Amino acid sequence: MAIIADPKTGKTYKKEIPAERMGSLVGRKIGDEIDGVFFDLVGYKLVVTGGSSIDGFPMRSDLQTQGKKQILVSYKKGYRGKNGIRKRITVRGSIIGSDISQINLKIVQYGPTPLEEKKDDQQA
């Protein structure tokens, strides 16, 4: 599943990714630009901003791996404890693998038709 954020309107849209297209996204990283044709959005350019795995672990942009890692974090992305307290949490790397169930995307270039006019989109 892809969650596409529209920065102009502040709305998000859900798109299901077919299995044959998901294989072409494997190996992309957080921050990579993807053509909107993957999601039937002709003319759009999207940037990967994150995601989560089948197990529910979030992707983290500073880990250059596909697998899970246990890292020690303080008050930052993935842990919101009190200041000075650190905790070991499990996160996914920044590379999209076959076990990623949700990909978060942001629109950076708009196409000729607005997302609101797409009939098969669902608002998240």
Swiss-Prot record:
GO biological process annotation, one example: translation
Organism: Thermoplasma acidophilum (strain ATCC 25905 / DSM 1728 / JCM 9062 / NBRC 15155 / AMRC-C165)
InterPro entries referenced in this protein's UniProt entry, alphabetically: Ribosomal_eS6, Ribosomal_eS6_arc
PANTHER family with a match to the protein in the record: 40S RIBOSOMAL PROTEIN S6
Organism lineage string: Archaea, Methanobacteriati, Thermoplasmatota, Thermoplasmata, Thermoplasmatales
Signal peptide: none
Family annotation (NCBIfam families): PRK04290.1-3 (NF003294)
Taxonomy, superkingdom: Archaea
Pfam families the UniProt entry points to: Ribosomal_S6e (PF01092)
Family note: Belongs to the eukaryotic ribosomal protein eS6 family.
GO function term, MF aspect, one: structural constituent of ribosome
Keywords: Ribonucleoprotein, Ribosomal protein
Protein name (Swiss-Prot/TrEMBL): Small ribosomal subunit protein eS6
GO cellular component: ribonucleoprotein complex; ribosome
HAMAP family in the cross-refs: Ribosomal_eS6 (MF_00512)
